[in-house]
């Protein structure tokens, strides 16, 4: 039996793989404007603080390969081939779509490695993929828009919260902070579902883990003058401590799916500076990365998308 071929377009933000790639990467994020030496030095220092470069590039590769393998195990009649498309560094999203076309792929399914939909992220990734496909005449792409409430995703974080709580003696004095990457506040005016989806994710995990001490915050906001979604996780940490006297903070950056700069620096360094200053305990559960239970989650999301009537 001839297997049907489907392209698996896995999209993500991207990260520099070497120190030399930091400047072009940052320039692309800034829409072609080169960063000042001061900004470049600041970003480079952050990377150096987590070991030189982010482990994200390898993790994203591992996630795409593992997802391809899992889907090929699940389907007897379909052969999946994964293509990585990145937002700010090669291989760009457009490169991946072109490669699928070159490989003779006529049908594809796409997923962004970010659970919550926003006009800034998922809509823009999917838009770029569809635009390129239209421009070059294929392949036809079915796109996943969000998976923030996928039961296997929620269960991953429920297990992480439970495992972390098991290490804490005074559980009544522990608080979980659920967070995602902040975006400009103006998205709320456009009716963007991003903030509400993060809240729903937090509520579902809290319910599953049976916790009532939790809050939602935002992190890693951009370096621009416009207002960004808040409260920032560092400010939130101080407020929660002052209001409730918590002695343990558990940071769950559920808007992210891997160890990278925003987690390894913004959480593990910047938030820990705050908890150390307050004299309280810092906990940050393991990120999904390419763990089998997370790959199962992504595969389930893809299965559901393919089962939809077009």
From Swiss-Prot:
CDD domains named in the record: Ferrochelatase_C, Ferrochelatase_N
Q: Which GO terms describe its biological process?
A: heme biosynthetic process
Q: Broadest EC class?
A: lyase
Xref: InterPro entries: Ferrochelatase, Ferrochelatase_AS, Ferrochelatase_C, Ferrochelatase_N
Pathway per its UniProt entry is:
Porphyrin-containing compound metabolism; protoheme biosynthesis
Any one of the GO CC terms: cytoplasm
Where Fe(2+) binds, per the record, is at: 181, 262
Q: Per UniProt, what is one GO molecular function of this protein?
A: metal ion binding
Question: Mind listing the UniProt keywords for this protein, alphabetically?
Answer: Cytoplasm, Heme biosynthesis, Iron, Lyase, Metal-binding, Porphyrin biosynthesis
Positions that bind Fe-coproporphyrin III = 13, 30, 46-47, 54, 125
Where does the source fall among the domains of life?
A: Bacteria
Where does it reside? Cytoplasm
Q: Its family?
A: Belongs to the ferrochelatase family.
Q: Which HAMAP family match?
A: Ferrochelatase
**Role of this protein:** Involved in coproporphyrin-dependent heme b biosynthesis. Catalyzes the insertion of ferrous iron into coproporphyrin III to form Fe-coproporphyrin III.
- Protein name per Swiss-Prot or TrEMBL: Coproporphyrin III ferrochelatase
Q: Which organism is it from?
A: Halalkalibacterium halodurans (strain ATCC BAA-125 / DSM 18197 / FERM 7344 / JCM 9153 / C-125)
Recorded name of the encoding gene:
cpfC
């Amino acid at each position: 039996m001839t297997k049907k071929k489907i392209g698996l377009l896995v999209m993500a933000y991207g990260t520099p793989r070497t120190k030399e790639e930091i400047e072009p990467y940052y320039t692309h994020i800034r829409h072609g404007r080169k960063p000042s030496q001061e900004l470049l030095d600041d970003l480079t220092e952050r990377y150096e603080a987590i070991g030189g470069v982010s482990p994200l590039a390898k993790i994203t590769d591992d996630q795409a390969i593992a997802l391809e393998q899992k889907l090929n195990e699940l389907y007897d009649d379909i052969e999946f081939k994964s293509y990585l498309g990145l937002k700010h560094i090669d291989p760009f999203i457009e490169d991946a779509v072109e490669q699928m076309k070159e490989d003779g792929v006529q049908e594809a399914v796409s997923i962004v490695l970010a659970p919550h939909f926003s006009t800034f992220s998922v809509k823009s990734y999917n838009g770029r993929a569809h635009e390129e496909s239209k421009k070059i005449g294929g392949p036809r792409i079915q796109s996943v828009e969000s998976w923030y409430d996928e039961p296997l995703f929620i269960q991953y974080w429920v297990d992480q919260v439970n495992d972390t709580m098991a290490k804490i003696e005074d559980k009544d004095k522990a608080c979980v902070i659920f967070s995602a990457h902040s975006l400009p506040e103006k998205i709320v005016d456009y009716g963007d579902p991003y903030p509400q989806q993060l809240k729903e994710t937090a509520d579902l995990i809290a319910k599953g883990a049976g916790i009532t001490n939790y809050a939602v915050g935002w992190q890693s906001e951009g370096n621009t003058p416009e207002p960004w979604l808040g409260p920032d996780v560092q400010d939130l940490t101080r407020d929660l401590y002052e209001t409730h006297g918590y002695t343990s903070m558990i940071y769950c950056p559920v808007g992210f799916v891997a160890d990278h700069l925003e987690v390894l620096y913004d959480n593990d360094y910047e938030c820990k500076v705050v908890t150390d200053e307050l004299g309280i305990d810092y906990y940050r559960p393991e990120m999904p990365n390419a763990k089998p239970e997370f790959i199962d989650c992504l595969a389930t999301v893809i299965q559901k998308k393919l089962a939809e009537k077009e």
